């Protein structure tokens, strides 16, 4: 079971390291956790920071297309890379990465196909 955590970003070079650091590297029931950053036309070093952090996948949009577009690109890309489960989190460190195992638990237990939280 592969989990890809997608992070749509716009000028998040300062907060992205906090977000990536907070994401659990191992989760019970998940064989592989990967991180995907979708850089929505940032004018700062968001993509470079993502690369320095060693995230698994980076998609750079040539200009700001908006959060909804970046989100959809992230979903399509995560599926292309074989994600069984996709979690979206924000690049501004708004959500706690430690909540990801609780978020996906109903999916792993076959109690839900989608979870929003």
Ranges and model annotations:
Residues 1-117:
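Structured catalytic core of nucleotide-sugar glycosyltransferases
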